[in-house]
Amino acid sequence: MPSFDIVSEVDFVEVRNAVDNSARELKTRFDFKNVEASITFDKEIVKITTESDFQLTQLVSILRGNLAKREVDAQSMTQKDTVRTGKAWACNVEFKQGIESDTAKKVVKTIKDAKLKVQASIQGEKVRVTAKKRDDLQAAMALVRNNEELGQPFQFDNFRD
């Protein structure tokens, strides 16, 4: 029986490249001239520090743009609380890796509510979808890909015929 897995993974090599491009852009931007600002990547977390809240927002926007250029979905990015220490503002940006159980249940429920002739089952941090026909699997892929309510980007992996 044909099957595929629904996963949610972020390519951290591309994230590192986007952070490096953002740091390069930070050095050339006029509005960041003579300003203590930095953007670093360390163990799946991007740390952003600046002198003001507005500049922090600008740096996050630069990062989002560079992530989009590197084809990393911005929905996988979650910005943590902004912290002010002395005259510096800082925030951490984390990336969703894997499908949480609540989201996996929503995916399975969405597929079952569509009344497609497929079976969806949760297997750890991925959802396996099986069917008798390849066309049914492709319909399930389109359904999950176009569903905005799930709030997380998905990739389709391990397609077997």
UniProtKB/Swiss-Prot annotation:
This is Nucleotide-binding protein PBPRA2024. Keywords: Nucleotide-binding. One of its GO terms (cellular component) is cytosol. SUPFAM superfamilies: YajQ-like. Pfam families: DUF520. The keyword Ligase does not apply. The keyword Lyase does not apply. InterPro entries: DUF520, UPF0234-like_C, UPF0234_N, YajQ-like_sf. Nucleotide-binding protein. It comes from Photobacterium profundum (strain SS9). Belongs to the YajQ family. One of its GO terms (molecular function) is nucleotide binding.
